[in-house]
Amino acid sequence: MGNVRAYIYFGALLSFVNHKLGVTMSNWLSDSIMVKKGEANGKQNSSHSITEDSQGKYHYVLGAYAEPVLTVDPGALISVETHDAFEGKIEKETDKPSEILNVPYLNPQNGPIFVNGARKGDTLAVYIKSMKPRGEQPVGTTCLISEFGGLVGTKDTAMLNDPLPEIVKKVVVDEKGVHWSKNLILPYQPFIGTIGTSPEIEAITSLQPDYYGGNMDVPDVAVGNVIYLPVNKDGAYLYLGDCHAAQGDGELCGVAIEHPTVTEIQVDLIKNWEIANPRVESEKFFMSIGSGRPMEDAVRRAYRDLVFWMEKDWGYDKLEAYF
């Protein structure tokens, strides 16, 4: 499943975007869609936590059939203890993913979180306040998995060449960086790989991205940014997990620097603001995320949403926005 994010950062909206530049995070957030339209207007009204113990069972599908682990009002600040994508099962570099992992039981999700007042046609706003690695080092895990990734044949697209060997790399991850080797420390740039609301009636694997969010693996779903998710079911049923310490655009080999975290989010609710697919707002950009196959369809979905967004919310002529 391809993912594309499209940005609004060009002439038509440059003056609006520049209004955000050079200001502190707190100031830009006060000018955000979440604060302007949200029921809580960016104000924190309660604090909660979801630990491994309180979560209990992690979920491998996004759906409305699991009992909510937490019920909150808009404005709630929530600290969440997430697992890595493998639920901690890969412990050492001699481990073989093919022997340890039980596909499709990957990408364990915290939640669901029930948000009071959320109804179909509303939008859930999630501000990602902070992310920190947790657990005993080395907490970072990445690997090559046979027949998995963007430059290899898969079981569905088999080639004559032999599959790549299985390789596991464990790395120390702290707030100073990803300690890849003695000579290389990568920046610590954490983001939420999988986040979404429940579809209306389906329960869909957490490995899949679509209109409700899911396994998008978009690096902009990061600390300091707000992701907007469509509400398809009363209560929204928010899930999140699969946090990454570092990743390029695309997760080409199929696996990022996976790590468990303590992730702090603040949720708000925007009534009667209906969106077709996830959107992200940062200090500099408005973004739309399109998911689909082939990748061309993901591109069309993302840019189409931007065009309609500009037309509906900022008053641009549709064809002018298309330019």
Language-model regions: role of each:
Residues 38, 47-101:
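N-terminal, Lys/Arg-enriched amphipathic/low-complexity engagement segments
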Residues 130-223:
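Intrinsically disordered, low-complexity linker/loop segments enriched in Gly/Pro
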Residues 85-95, 131-142, 235-245:
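Short, Lys/Arg- and Gly-enriched loop/turn segments at beta-strand edges
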Residues 72, 115-118, 221:
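Short, well-ordered loop/turn sites that connect or cap secondary structure elements
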Residues 192, 198-215, 219-220, 225-296:
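Conserved mixed alpha/beta catalytic, RNA-binding, or beta-rich assembly cores of soluble enzyme
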Residues 53-63, 103-109, 204-212:
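Short, structured beta-strand/loop micro-motifs enriched in basic residues and often containing a Trp
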